[in-house]
Amino acid sequence: MASFGYFLFLCGLSQALSSYPIWWSLAIGHQYSSLGTQPILCGSIPGLVPKQLRFCRNYVEIMPSVAEGVKIGIQECQHQFRGRRWNCTTVNDSLAIFGPVLDKATRESAFVHAIASAGVAFAVTRSCAEGSATICGCDTRHKGSPGEGWKWGGCSEDVEFGSMVSREFADARENRPDARSAMNRHNNEAGRTSIIELMHLKCKCHGLSGSCEVKTCWWSQPDFRVIGDYLKDKYDSASEMVVEKHRESRGWVETLRPKYNFFKAPTEKDLVYYENSPNFCEPNPETGSFGTRDRICNVTSHGIDGCDLLCCGRGHNTRTEKRKEKCHCIFHWCCYVRCQECIRVYDVHTCK
């Protein structure tokens, strides 16, 4: 049944390409890993609007970091949704790497845009701090009186530059006066804002025998997993919006406002959406759902990863699986650990 669902899914891909940020596909294309040495490849990246193409050619040395940023964003999405009905599945042989699932203005679309935008900002910022590009480096603006017992040192990561790159590149195609562009711009910025919110000081001690007479400190990004956890919380509390039309000098413009006035209005840190998500229980070529048949579920969980919810009430199958594992490990002085190899039997539960 899973293969049938995959076939149905592929049938709907052609409908997805028109409104897709298909440049995300550079995250899974090995041919883009050498962008820094082959600028002509900018023209081969699919789906670039003219502004993105100019940016790529002007700043080609940071384009590998842009590709890496989208890649880590996708990987983090798959981690955060690993136990949900929609698990951020990608299709490697398609330009629409998530399929039609992102055609709708749902919570899932909001999260993917936010995490991809954050990934680009994060990867570019980290690359600059590591000295991988000549056009950027460390942030030298965090100077002044730092505090008693420590001073500025090391390399503060320039998240403002990374966010600028993400904003100029990722938002370049979101300039239409419609609600979806407004939603994408907002969620892209929420992704970038998450990094700024989570920046923290890292310090290193200096002195005789580690006495820490003086500390040098610098601003650092968190692990990207922390950003993913933060944005997943924003996904769970995303604000539902409604579309309003206004007539301006340039014509009709669509904007978003909160659907419910008794809830707090979303800030620039929050995710927004205006269309309901499908239930993702069955394969559906129109929504891009793979369904949940044959997905591994947790028989002891009452949460969304549990067999009751993940399998959508269809029940589950159970099979036994033998695995080789290290066991009876003993530490020997000095200094190694010797283990035996054991065969252990596990129950594996999959959705019907």
Swiss-Prot record:
Expression (tissue specificity): Expressed in cornea. Isoform 1 is expressed in the primitive streak, dorsal neural tube, proximal otic vesicle, the apical ectodermal ridge and the epithelium of feather buds.
Assigned keywords, A-Z: Cytoplasm, Developmental protein, Disulfide bond, Extracellular matrix, Glycoprotein, Lipoprotein, Secreted, Signal, Wnt signaling pathway
GO annotation, biological process: BMP signaling pathway; canonical Wnt signaling pathway; cell fate commitment; cornea development in camera-type eye; determination of dorsal identity; dorsal/ventral pattern formation; inner ear morphogenesis; limb development
Keyword flag Nucleus: no
GO cellular component annotations of the record: cytosol; endoplasmic reticulum; extracellular space; nuclear outer membrane; plasma membrane
SMART domains per the UniProt record, alphabetical: WNT1 (SM00097)
Name of the protein described by the UniProt record: Protein Wnt-3a
Family: Belongs to the Wnt family.
